[in-house]
Amino acid sequence: MANEKQYPMTKEGKEKLEQELEYLKTVKRKEVVERIKIARGFGDLSENSEYDAAKDEQAFVESRIQMLENMIRNAVIIEEDKENPDVVSLGKSVTFIELPDGEEETYTIVGSAEADPFEGKISNDSPIAKSLLGRRVGDEVTVQTPGGEMLVKIVAVK
């Protein structure tokens, strides 16, 4: 158990996972069990697509519960780095411009457990985050992306 993977995350990220876990345990799990009961009432289980779908969903829910419990148990809360406010670090938002065109992008660098690119939260394991971590406002950085290299200039860290 001592070698379990640790999951760096913000306090808010951990709270979000705890809320999802609570929902799965108190609401979703019961809904799925009820769907299984109803599907069993349809008779022969060998050709019962409703039963198969409900059992598949039950397996997914139970797997997600186990995964969330593990991530929460092994969460490492990211503390704000007040001593280096202009240095890119885990839990901070970084704004950069792509050079030479000047397109601006902002991301918050978080642990993989709470990464959500659609919300502007990228994993510290992503190529962009790896290139930016430890850098300062004003630094120009070459970032490796699936589409190739891009040069960026860090303009803000919050």
Curated annotation (Swiss-Prot):
General function of this protein: Necessary for efficient RNA polymerase transcription elongation past template-encoded arresting sites. The arresting sites in DNA have the property of trapping a certain fraction of elongating RNA polymerases that pass through, resulting in locked ternary complexes. Cleavage of the nascent transcript by cleavage factors such as GreA or GreB allows the resumption of elongation from the new 3'terminus. GreA releases sequences of 2 to 3 nucleotides.
Family matches, as Pfam families: GreA_GreB (PF01272), GreA_GreB_N (PF03449)
Coiled coil: 10-75
Keywords linked to the UniProt accession: Coiled coil, DNA-binding, Transcription, Transcription regulation
Family, per entry: Belongs to the GreA/GreB family.
One BP annotation, GO: regulation of DNA-templated transcription elongation
Entry-linked Gene3D superfamilies: Transcription elongation factor, GreA/GreB, C-terminal domain, Transcription elongation factor, GreA/GreB, N-terminal domain
Name of the protein: Transcription elongation factor GreA
PROSITE patterns (UniProt xref): GREAB_1, GREAB_2
Domain of life: Bacteria
Gene Ontology MF, one: RNA polymerase binding
Cited SUPFAM superfamilies: FKBP-like, GreA transcript cleavage protein, N-terminal domain
Organism in which the protein naturally occurs: Geobacillus kaustophilus (strain HTA426)
